[in-house]
UniProtKB/Swiss-Prot annotation:
Family statement: Belongs to the CDC6/cdc18 family.
Coiled coil location: none
Function: Involved in regulation of DNA replication.
The protein, known as: ORC1-type DNA replication protein 3
A GO molecular-function descriptor: ATP binding
Amino acid sequence: MSIRDTLKGGKGEVIKDPRVFIDPLTVFKDIPFREDILKEVAVAVRYFVKSDVKFSTLFLGLTGTGKTFVARYMLNEIEEVKQEDSDYSKVKQAYVNCREVGGTPQAVLSALTERLTTDEVPKHGINLGEYIEKIKEELNGKKALVYLDEVDTLIKRRGGDIVLYQLLRADADISVIMISNDINIRDYMEPRVLSSLGPTVFFKPYDAEQLKHILSIYAEYGLYRGTYDDNILSYIAAISAKEHGDARKAVNLLFRAAQLASGEGFIRKDHVDRAIIEYEQERLIEAIKALPFHYKLALMATMDAEDVVTAHKIYSDLCNQYKQKPLSYRRFSDIISELDMFGIIKVKIINKGRAGGIRKYIEITDKDKIRKALEDTMNLGFEEQW
């Protein structure tokens, strides 16, 4: 297929509407296998709007189990109901992905205040309480429903608990839905925050049959008829079910496989296999970008070291360069072990005998990709990482 034919589309095209994969809320009129959760949240929202009963809840589940999708769906439904029920006209909503805005208490509250008020909000120079006061002034009799996605990145930061506590205990009609894939997130919360927190909603992983059903909806609306078959959907669903039932992965694999099949008219197994390889590479990059600051420094140090001892020396030099206090060799070694566990690097332990002792050697297969991912993130404001 020539470049011109590809640009024009038509012959052998597989994807009918790419928007289905990019913004599925335009297609889904309900969310399969999450109806009970949606109803539970809808009841809480109704009591909040109509009976002044504030609530807070935590959406907890592994990646790709529908937490963000349910939150986004509920946000959209509430906006639609505003046209039908005047009680909802005074409800303001704000969705913030804590990781994407930086994760610090200052960054999260700044983003939240911007979304709930009409004023331009400074990201520095005012204390956390002032953000809350700005929100309260803006509401002035109205209600606010706040969605904090990837809230674990906030909770694990110094002062992150203060943000939640102030929101949950604010003298204003604010209800909060928090979203996290860290099943141990409650361990990072202070007792006063836990006592203010409402029930936790657990999102169970999808099984292969459920994933196949979800994929069939995406395929029906997003792909041309006859460009895929039942076996392809089953294959993708089975692969994704093995990894804690990740619907996001399943949908991404189907979309990428369809892109690879463009011009050929049909999605084959080898298209899916290629999509899997690309997906794993992209996930590696995202994992690196999400690492804490000193983990990134440790990883950067391994790029030019063959063993852990040498890497620690390079790491210490990097800490001096970035005006950070180096972690001890023992803690650094623990971080290297964690990076090994994450699959980012590989550590090989070799016993050199009585004279040489035990040495930990470092092996890295994707140095270029890791370097690029580090370069993209190492220009962040490190003073905010601690």
